A protein has these predicted regions:
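Conserved beta-strand in the GNAT
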Residues: 50, 56-65, 82
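Conserved active-site alpha-helix within GNAT-family acetyltransferase domains
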Residues: 94, 118-136
Length: 143
């Protein structure tokens, strides 16, 4: 299976939106997605890559470079990773993780964090298989 990984482009927004809504149960619309990506596309801290199969977007990974006291080079926070359901278990998620890890290494970043839903046990197993440890809790409060 020939998968191409590249940075997101404007014509990918609708596909990424669809994959995100399906994977995470969101109900975002194209206007929301366009506003978001237009806001962050020229900001070095944000990076989104898409996976293409036969020129179709079948997955994506988004991250933000954050800083914290005591973490001089900061860390990369994966804020979204999803692959179309029928394309899962074909190595696409692995290629996306490898791409974001290579990007982090190029920037001198030595730590990547991510959050995943408690119910997403398949995702938990995937991240553990890639060397990620689950040694913290994430709390969320919506206003």
């Amino acid at each position: 299976m020939d998968i191409i990984i590249r940075e997101i482009e404007e014509n990918d927004y609708l596909d990424v939106l669809s994959i995100s809504n399906n994977a995470f149960g969101c109900k975002h619309n194209l206007e929301d997605a366009t506003i978001h990506y237009e806001r962050v596309k020229n900001d070095e801290r944000y990076k989104t890559f898409v996976a293409l199969f036969n020129d179709d977007v079948v997955g994506f990974i988004s991250s933000v470079w954050s800083y914290a006291i005591g973490c001089e080079v900061g860390f990369l926070h994966i804020v979204g990773l999803a692959v179309e359901l029928e394309m899962q278990n074909k190595g696409i998620g692995t290629k996306l993780i490898e791409q974001i890890e290579n990007y982090a290494k190029e920037k001198g970043i030595r730590s990547i964090i991510l959050n995943t839903g408690v119910q997403r046990t398949g995702a938990h197993a995937f991240y553990k298989s890639k060397g990620y440890d689950n040694h913290s809790w994430c709390f969320n409060k919506t206003f």
